[in-house]
Amino acid sequence: MPRESLHRQNIIACIWDFDKTLIPGYMQAPIFRAYNIDEESFWREVNALPEIYGERGTRVSHDTVYLNHLISHVKNGDLKGLTNQRLRELGGELEFYPGIAELFDRLRELPESQPQYRKHNIRLEHYIVSTGLAEMIRGSAIAPHVDDIFACEFIEAP
């Protein structure tokens, strides 16, 4: 195969999880504080849901079943006024491990600062892939340091 027909990539993608990777806990904590929902009870209920649904013949993902529980709280009025704008605001309350934003920036600059990488136009990009809420991540301090966010969307008017 001729050299010029080979498809060459020059982008290094760093894929980051969010909860307990970039932040010490779960991103939903600011929601629980804002709406006076007991966080421990919420997660205990969520952890019981796969078995409850399983008894009904429905298999659910342990990672995303919490979203159904959040929707139940919205429908029951416990999360009255929860919107994407509010999620973005609450995302601003998320506290990251110390130095995360600086680490993202330093990693991005590394290939640009090395001649052997610069000559090939090697770039480093940051992406967040999470089962968390995208709007909260977009409202957080890390958002300006990432290239894209792939997470769960809160649909206000389905």
Q: Model-derived features: where do they sit?
A:
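Alpha-helical substrate-recognition element adjacent to the catalytic core
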Residues: 1-157
